[in-house]
Amino acid sequence: MKNDDVILLCDHAVFQGEKKNPILWALWFPLGILVALCRVTLLVIYTVLIQACSVETKKKSYIRLLRLIGIKVTSNLDYDTVKKHTNGCVVAANHISVFDHFPALAMPLSTLMVHHVDSIAGKVMGFLLFKGSGSAYWQVTDLKQMVKKFREWKKSPDGVALYVTPEATINNRRGLFRFRHDFLVRGRPVVPMAMTLRLPFGLSPNPIDSSGIAKFLRLLTSPTLHFNLDYLDTIPAYVSEAESGTPQEYADRVQQSIAQHLGIPATHVTREEKHQYRAGRKK
Protein backbone atom coordinates (compact mmCIF):
# COMPACT_ATOMS: atom_id res chain seq x y z
CA MET A 1 0.00 0.00 0.00
CA LYS A 2 1.17 3.52 -0.81
CA ASN A 3 0.16 6.28 1.60
CA ASP A 4 -0.62 8.48 -1.40
CA ASP A 5 -3.37 6.06 -2.42
CA VAL A 6 -5.07 6.33 0.99
CA ILE A 7 -4.54 10.09 1.25
CA LEU A 8 -6.52 10.50 -1.98
CA LEU A 9 -9.60 9.13 -0.22
CA CYS A 10 -9.26 10.88 3.15
CA ASP A 11 -10.00 14.44 4.25
CA HIS A 12 -7.56 15.79 6.80
CA ALA A 13 -9.13 19.19 7.50
CA VAL A 14 -12.58 20.10 8.79
CA PHE A 15 -13.04 22.64 5.98
CA GLN A 16 -12.32 21.90 2.32
CA GLY A 17 -12.43 23.59 -1.07
CA GLU A 18 -13.05 27.10 -2.34
CA LYS A 19 -16.19 27.57 -0.23
CA LYS A 20 -14.49 26.88 3.11
CA ASN A 21 -15.40 29.51 5.66
CA PRO A 22 -14.46 28.56 9.25
CA ILE A 23 -15.17 32.10 10.51
CA LEU A 24 -18.77 32.00 9.29
CA TRP A 25 -19.11 28.50 10.77
CA ALA A 26 -17.86 29.77 14.15
CA LEU A 27 -20.42 32.59 14.05
CA TRP A 28 -23.18 30.13 13.12
CA PHE A 29 -22.26 27.46 15.69
CA PRO A 30 -24.16 28.87 18.75
CA LEU A 31 -27.32 28.99 16.64
CA GLY A 32 -26.40 25.56 15.28
CA ILE A 33 -26.62 24.13 18.80
CA LEU A 34 -30.21 25.36 19.01
CA VAL A 35 -30.93 23.90 15.57
CA ALA A 36 -29.54 20.53 16.69
CA LEU A 37 -31.72 20.56 19.82
CA CYS A 38 -34.79 21.44 17.75
CA ARG A 39 -34.02 18.63 15.29
CA VAL A 40 -33.73 16.04 18.04
CA THR A 41 -36.85 17.33 19.84
CA LEU A 42 -38.94 17.26 16.67
CA LEU A 43 -37.66 13.77 15.85
CA VAL A 44 -38.62 12.47 19.30
CA ILE A 45 -42.12 14.01 19.11
CA TYR A 46 -42.63 12.75 15.56
CA THR A 47 -41.47 9.22 16.39
CA VAL A 48 -43.87 8.95 19.32
CA LEU A 49 -46.85 10.29 17.36
CA ILE A 50 -46.30 8.28 14.16
CA GLN A 51 -46.15 4.81 15.72
CA ALA A 52 -49.83 4.01 15.14
CA CYS A 53 -49.54 4.70 11.40
CA SER A 54 -48.78 2.31 8.53
CA VAL A 55 -45.28 1.89 7.13
CA GLU A 56 -46.26 3.72 3.94
CA THR A 57 -47.55 6.68 5.97
CA LYS A 58 -44.39 6.67 8.09
CA LYS A 59 -42.21 6.77 4.98
CA LYS A 60 -43.94 9.75 3.40
CA SER A 61 -44.23 11.60 6.71
CA TYR A 62 -40.55 10.94 7.42
CA ILE A 63 -39.56 12.60 4.12
CA ARG A 64 -41.57 15.68 5.14
CA LEU A 65 -39.92 15.64 8.58
CA LEU A 66 -36.45 15.64 7.02
CA ARG A 67 -37.40 18.63 4.89
CA LEU A 68 -38.76 20.42 7.97
CA ILE A 69 -35.49 19.99 9.90
CA GLY A 70 -33.32 21.15 7.02
CA ILE A 71 -32.30 17.83 5.47
CA LYS A 72 -33.15 17.79 1.77
CA VAL A 73 -33.31 14.48 -0.11
CA THR A 74 -33.58 14.44 -3.91
CA SER A 75 -33.39 11.61 -6.43
CA ASN A 76 -33.27 11.01 -10.17
CA LEU A 77 -36.37 8.78 -9.79
CA ASP A 78 -39.71 9.44 -8.14
CA TYR A 79 -40.89 7.46 -5.11
CA ASP A 80 -42.96 4.86 -6.97
CA THR A 81 -40.26 4.29 -9.60
CA VAL A 82 -37.65 3.75 -6.89
CA LYS A 83 -39.99 1.21 -5.30
CA LYS A 84 -40.30 -0.78 -8.54
CA HIS A 85 -36.62 -0.43 -9.46
CA THR A 86 -35.23 -1.64 -6.12
CA ASN A 87 -37.82 -4.22 -5.02
CA GLY A 88 -36.05 -7.48 -4.16
CA CYS A 89 -32.61 -6.03 -4.95
CA VAL A 90 -29.42 -5.18 -3.11
CA VAL A 91 -28.94 -1.39 -3.33
CA ALA A 92 -25.21 -0.65 -3.23
CA ALA A 93 -24.26 2.92 -2.28
CA ASN A 94 -21.03 4.81 -1.83
CA HIS A 95 -20.42 5.75 1.82
CA ILE A 96 -19.90 9.50 2.34
CA SER A 97 -20.96 10.42 5.90
CA VAL A 98 -22.22 9.20 9.26
CA PHE A 99 -25.65 10.51 8.19
CA ASP A 100 -26.02 8.31 5.09
CA HIS A 101 -28.86 6.40 6.73
CA PHE A 102 -31.01 9.57 6.89
CA PRO A 103 -31.83 9.57 3.14
CA ALA A 104 -31.75 5.78 2.76
CA LEU A 105 -34.49 5.39 5.37
CA ALA A 106 -36.70 7.72 3.33
CA MET A 107 -36.66 5.32 0.39
CA PRO A 108 -39.47 2.77 -0.20
CA LEU A 109 -38.92 -0.82 0.99
CA SER A 110 -35.54 0.11 2.51
CA THR A 111 -33.89 -2.30 4.91
CA LEU A 112 -30.38 -1.35 6.01
CA MET A 113 -27.40 -3.52 6.88
CA VAL A 114 -26.03 -1.85 10.02
CA HIS A 115 -22.56 -2.10 11.57
CA HIS A 116 -21.58 -0.98 15.05
CA VAL A 117 -22.24 2.63 16.06
CA ASP A 118 -19.45 4.43 17.90
CA SER A 119 -21.40 6.90 20.04
CA ILE A 120 -24.41 6.74 22.34
CA ALA A 121 -25.84 9.78 20.53
CA GLY A 122 -25.61 7.89 17.24
CA LYS A 123 -27.37 4.87 18.72
CA VAL A 124 -30.22 6.99 20.11
CA MET A 125 -30.60 8.87 16.83
CA GLY A 126 -30.55 5.62 14.87
CA PHE A 127 -33.28 4.14 17.09
CA LEU A 128 -35.51 7.18 16.54
CA LEU A 129 -34.90 7.22 12.79
CA PHE A 130 -35.71 3.55 12.26
CA LYS A 131 -38.82 3.77 14.42
CA GLY A 132 -39.96 6.97 12.75
CA SER A 133 -39.35 5.87 9.16
CA GLY A 134 -40.86 2.41 9.44
CA SER A 135 -37.70 0.80 8.07
CA ALA A 136 -35.95 -2.31 9.34
CA TYR A 137 -32.29 -3.16 9.77
CA TRP A 138 -30.09 -6.25 9.85
CA GLN A 139 -27.23 -6.20 12.34
CA VAL A 140 -24.03 -7.29 10.59
CA THR A 141 -22.41 -8.44 13.84
CA ASP A 142 -25.38 -10.71 14.67
CA LEU A 143 -24.46 -13.67 12.46
CA LYS A 144 -27.44 -15.75 13.57
CA GLN A 145 -29.85 -12.98 12.60
CA MET A 146 -28.05 -12.38 9.29
CA VAL A 147 -28.24 -16.03 8.26
CA LYS A 148 -31.93 -16.15 9.17
CA LYS A 149 -32.76 -12.91 7.34
CA PHE A 150 -30.93 -13.87 4.15
CA ARG A 151 -32.59 -17.29 4.15
CA GLU A 152 -36.02 -15.67 4.48
CA TRP A 153 -35.21 -13.07 1.82
CA LYS A 154 -34.06 -15.72 -0.63
CA LYS A 155 -37.41 -17.50 -0.26
CA SER A 156 -39.46 -14.30 -0.48
CA PRO A 157 -37.51 -11.31 -1.88
CA ASP A 158 -40.55 -9.18 -2.68
CA GLY A 159 -41.04 -6.13 -0.46
CA VAL A 160 -37.41 -5.67 0.61
CA ALA A 161 -34.70 -3.45 -0.86
CA LEU A 162 -31.48 -4.16 1.05
CA TYR A 163 -29.30 -1.03 1.28
CA VAL A 164 -25.59 -1.69 1.78
CA THR A 165 -22.34 0.31 1.72
CA PRO A 166 -19.80 -2.16 0.26
CA GLU A 167 -16.81 0.08 1.03
CA ALA A 168 -17.50 -0.60 4.73
CA THR A 169 -15.85 2.75 5.50
CA ILE A 170 -16.45 6.41 4.65
CA ASN A 171 -14.69 8.03 1.69
CA ASN A 172 -14.12 11.75 1.09
CA ARG A 173 -16.35 11.98 -2.02
CA ARG A 174 -13.32 12.23 -4.33
CA GLY A 175 -12.83 8.49 -4.85
CA LEU A 176 -14.18 5.09 -3.78
CA PHE A 177 -12.63 2.48 -1.54
CA ARG A 178 -12.74 -1.01 -3.02
CA PHE A 179 -16.14 -2.67 -2.75
CA ARG A 180 -16.32 -5.89 -0.73
CA HIS A 181 -17.95 -8.74 -2.62
CA ASP A 182 -19.53 -10.29 0.49
CA PHE A 183 -21.95 -7.34 0.57
CA LEU A 184 -23.04 -7.91 -3.02
CA VAL A 185 -22.94 -11.60 -3.90
CA ARG A 186 -26.28 -12.53 -2.35
CA GLY A 187 -28.13 -14.17 -5.21
CA ARG A 188 -30.11 -10.99 -5.91
CA PRO A 189 -29.74 -8.27 -8.57
CA VAL A 190 -27.74 -5.21 -7.52
CA VAL A 191 -28.86 -1.61 -8.06
CA PRO A 192 -25.89 0.78 -7.79
CA MET A 193 -26.79 4.07 -6.13
CA ALA A 194 -24.55 7.13 -6.46
CA MET A 195 -24.99 9.43 -3.47
CA THR A 196 -23.75 12.99 -3.03
CA LEU A 197 -23.92 15.40 -0.09
CA ARG A 198 -23.72 19.18 -0.16
CA LEU A 199 -22.82 21.05 3.04
CA PRO A 200 -22.41 24.77 3.75
CA PHE A 201 -19.20 26.53 4.84
CA GLY A 202 -17.03 24.01 2.96
CA LEU A 203 -17.53 21.51 5.79
CA SER A 204 -16.01 18.07 5.34
CA PRO A 205 -18.39 15.34 6.53
CA ASN A 206 -15.61 12.95 7.53
CA PRO A 207 -12.19 14.34 8.58
CA ILE A 208 -10.01 11.31 9.26
CA ASP A 209 -8.73 12.49 12.64
CA SER A 210 -12.14 13.51 14.02
CA SER A 211 -14.00 11.28 16.45
CA GLY A 212 -17.33 9.77 15.55
CA ILE A 213 -19.21 12.09 17.92
CA ALA A 214 -17.47 15.19 16.47
CA LYS A 215 -18.49 14.21 12.92
CA PHE A 216 -22.03 13.51 14.11
CA LEU A 217 -22.39 16.86 15.93
CA ARG A 218 -20.98 18.91 13.04
CA LEU A 219 -23.61 17.48 10.71
CA LEU A 220 -26.38 17.77 13.29
CA THR A 221 -25.60 21.47 13.84
CA SER A 222 -25.20 22.27 10.13
CA PRO A 223 -27.93 24.65 8.88
CA THR A 224 -28.65 22.49 5.83
CA LEU A 225 -27.75 19.12 4.36
CA HIS A 226 -28.63 18.14 0.80
CA PHE A 227 -28.40 14.47 -0.19
CA ASN A 228 -28.95 13.44 -3.80
CA LEU A 229 -29.51 9.78 -4.69
CA ASP A 230 -29.04 8.65 -8.29
CA TYR A 231 -30.25 5.11 -8.96
CA LEU A 232 -28.33 3.47 -11.81
CA ASP A 233 -29.10 0.52 -14.10
CA THR A 234 -29.61 -2.83 -12.42
CA ILE A 235 -26.73 -5.31 -12.55
CA PRO A 236 -27.95 -8.94 -12.83
CA ALA A 237 -27.39 -11.17 -9.82
CA TYR A 238 -24.10 -13.01 -9.46
CA VAL A 239 -24.46 -16.55 -10.84
CA SER A 240 -21.09 -18.26 -11.04
CA GLU A 241 -17.45 -17.56 -11.82
CA ALA A 242 -17.94 -18.83 -15.36
CA GLU A 243 -20.85 -16.48 -16.02
CA SER A 244 -20.22 -13.51 -13.72
CA GLY A 245 -16.46 -13.61 -13.11
CA THR A 246 -14.97 -13.90 -9.65
CA PRO A 247 -16.97 -12.40 -6.78
CA GLN A 248 -14.42 -9.58 -6.49
CA GLU A 249 -14.61 -8.83 -10.22
CA TYR A 250 -18.38 -8.59 -9.83
CA ALA A 251 -18.00 -6.16 -6.92
CA ASP A 252 -15.51 -4.12 -8.94
CA ARG A 253 -18.10 -3.71 -11.71
CA VAL A 254 -20.62 -2.35 -9.23
CA GLN A 255 -17.99 0.02 -7.84
CA GLN A 256 -16.98 1.16 -11.32
CA SER A 257 -20.56 2.00 -12.30
CA ILE A 258 -20.92 4.39 -9.35
CA ALA A 259 -17.46 5.89 -9.84
CA GLN A 260 -18.11 6.49 -13.53
CA HIS A 261 -21.41 8.20 -12.78
CA LEU A 262 -19.79 10.49 -10.19
CA GLY A 263 -16.67 11.10 -12.28
CA ILE A 264 -14.29 9.90 -9.55
CA PRO A 265 -11.74 7.04 -9.41
CA ALA A 266 -12.70 3.52 -8.31
CA THR A 267 -9.62 2.52 -6.33
CA HIS A 268 -8.44 -0.79 -4.88
CA VAL A 269 -7.64 0.81 -1.51
CA THR A 270 -9.39 -1.16 1.25
CA ARG A 271 -10.97 -0.26 4.55
CA GLU A 272 -8.17 -2.09 6.35
CA GLU A 273 -5.53 0.03 4.62
CA LYS A 274 -7.34 3.19 5.68
CA HIS A 275 -7.42 1.98 9.29
CA GLN A 276 -3.69 1.21 9.15
CA TYR A 277 -3.01 4.69 7.81
CA ARG A 278 -5.11 6.35 10.52
CA ALA A 279 -3.46 4.30 13.26
CA GLY A 280 -0.04 5.33 11.92
CA ARG A 281 -1.01 9.01 12.13
CA LYS A 282 -1.76 8.65 15.84
CA LYS A 283 1.70 7.30 16.73
Model regions and ranges:
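A membrane-cytosol interface segment of integral membrane proteins
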Residues: G134-K154, T165-T169
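A cross-family acyltransferase "interaction/gating" segment
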Residues: V124, V160, N172-G245, K274-G280
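Short amphipathic alpha-helix with an adjacent loop that forms part of the alpha/beta core around
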Residues: L77-H85, V147-P157
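Residue-level preference for the first positions of well-ordered beta-strands
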Residues: G88-V90, S110, G159-T165, P189
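Soluble, non-transmembrane catalytic domains of enzymes that act on hydrophobic metabolites at membranes
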Residues: M1-Q16, T74-D78, H101-F102, L112-V114, ...
